Amino acid sequence: MLRSKLSSLREYLTPINHNSNFSTTGEISPEEFVQAGDYLVYKFPTWQWSTCPKNLQKSFLPADKQFLITRHVPSYQRASNYLTGGNVDFDDDEEYEDDEEGDGWVKSRKVVSVTKPQDGQEEEPQEINDIDDLIDVTAEGAEDDGDNLEDFDDLDIRNDGGSVRKYDMYITYSTSYRVPKMYLVGFNANGIPLTPDQMFEDINADYKDKTATIENLPVAHNTTSVSIHPCKHSSVMKVLMKHSKSKKTREEVNHLSEELGKTNISDKSQEDTGKDAEAAAGPEAEDSIRVDQYLVIFLKFIASVTPGIEYDYTMDAL
């Protein structure tokens, strides 16, 4: 717990910065953290603001908005099984996306999603190149699975003995890194707290040694948690915001191009129409990721660190 004490000391000694520069640095101020938390709670009511004992409260945050929490989030299988089982395979090639510091901490594998073949047809793999495509394919697969639930009335795969776990998830504000920080507190099927080693089983192996840490939960007394260390959160958030902004900009430009193509501007070439669409989308596209959406993108990142914990229902929030 030495690292936990050092982390607490660093949080205490770091002065509060109220300046806003999230779009350029990936960091947010305490006020922006509250704003992003309000948006998360509004969009996803399973997340709630909460208070903590007075001696643990941070004076720069409202007393009733010290941290965000969602409880009893299920985990049906361990991270290693989640990444190697089912219908999603990783090929041998790995892609690394370096942040601007060149640390290569944002790591992604090429993913091949195998679709269920029709009669007489072979399976055709669909390559997925970014996190949003993976989320979209996962959502489509969930819908397909829901259509076939009646075929499995007598089969309860998820509730397999003691494999089901529940997690309470806490999001606090880190003053030393100026980003949100995630804490996990897990319980087994009987409600008994998990040991740190057991909770580590639900952390992606690629991140275990880099970012997962055993700490005392800073908003409660005598509670052991696993934290997702925020040292690289800002650079990771910059990458994810860039991806989300790029995807949204492409969608807006394509939509505007289609709309302009329906108008009676006969002397415009297709290239000119595309330029007009980009110009029309420009200001909105530049600001497409708002600061209040920050925690939604943050959770997309955390979902890659804890792949077996099923809380990433944020696909349609942006």
UniProtKB/Swiss-Prot annotation:
Residues 83-104, 244-284 are annotated as: Disordered. One of its GO terms (cellular component) is mitochondrion. This is Autophagy-related protein 3. Pfam families: Autophagy_act_C. E2 conjugating enzyme required for the cytoplasm to vacuole transport (Cvt) and autophagy. Required for selective autophagic degradation of the nucleus (nucleophagy) as well as for mitophagy which contributes to regulate mitochondrial quantity and quality by eliminating the mitochondria to a basal level to fulfill cellular energy requirements and preventing excess ROS production. Responsible for the E2-like covalent binding of phosphatidylethanolamine to the C-terminal Gly of ATG8. It comes from the Eukaryota. One of its GO terms (biological process) is glycophagy. The active site is at C231 (glycyl thioester intermediate). Residues 235-293 are annotated as: Handle region. Residues 249-261, 268-278 have a biased composition (Basic and acidic residues). The N-terminal region is involved in phosphatidylethanolamine-binding and is required for ATG8-PE conjugation. The flexible region (FR) is required for ATG7-binding. The keyword Zinc does not apply. Residues 89-103 have a biased composition (Acidic residues). Keywords: Autophagy, Cytoplasm, Protein transport, Transport, Ubl conjugation pathway. Gene3D superfamilies: 3.30.1460.50. Residues 82-161 are annotated as: Flexible region.
